[in-house]
Amino acid sequence: MTALSALIRRDIRIALRVGGGALIGVLFFLTVVVLMPFAVGPDLALLSRLGPAILWLGALLASLLTLDRLFMADHEDGSLDLITMSRTPLELACAAKALAHWLAAGLPLIVATPVLGLLLNLDMVATGAVALTLLAGTPALTFTGMIGAALAVTLHRGGLLMAVLVLPLSIPVLIFGVAASQAVIVGPMSFGAPFSILCALSLVSLVIGPFAAAASLRHGLD
């Protein structure tokens, strides 16, 4: 347990450094959301309807932007080999690294959502709903993206391959995240059904992601 907590703290410190990746994802998310009102124009009703989709799409793209560094930096400096050979099960190490990535790169997006919701003409209830769906759904983006990052870690131009692998897995999360948010804003669909599916997707990814990523790393590093 001590080794896993040390790994989480280490990855968070690395991610929060300049060039570590977390800041890049947050700045990209802010840029996407801030520019969208200028692209949509003065129609505030349209902007509020598109608001949840804009926030979710920004979060998805920001997540993809930072996931390629999840294992790449460790592979480059040799620490990934040490993690693989340590007594700690590789599946738990992968889960710890994904959790650290979410805390450093995913959680700040959720914290920024209430402020950015004002730019998209969302009221407090709608903004809270979007933040809640991001809290429930962004772990799925991280843990499914971890599989693609593990597959691409030993490949040339692996970032492009990771995006191709991860995007299809992320589409259901995007669909149900936006659907749950839209249910609060426009109805008449119930918020509970898509939100429950979104939570289920995150739970499934929490279980499958570490095992699939560990298997990919073992195969790629052999």
UniProtKB/Swiss-Prot annotation:
Q: Does the keyword Iron-sulfur apply?
A: no
Q: Which organism is it from?
A: Bradyrhizobium diazoefficiens (strain JCM 10833 / BCRC 13528 / IAM 13628 / NBRC 14792 / USDA 110)
Q: Name one GO cellular component term.
A: plasma membrane
Kindly give the InterPro entries that the UniProt entry links to this protein.
Answer: Cyt_c_biogenesis_CcmB (IPR003544), Cyt_c_CcmB_bac (IPR026031)
Record's protein name: Heme exporter protein B
The free-text function statement in the UniProt record for this protein reads: Required for the export of heme to the periplasm for the biogenesis of c-type cytochromes.
Provide the membrane topology annotation.
Multi-pass membrane protein
Q: Which residues cross the membrane?
A: 20-40, 44-64, 102-122, 134-154, 160-180, 195-215
State the Gene Ontology BP annotations. Answer: cytochrome c biosynthetic process; cytochrome complex assembly
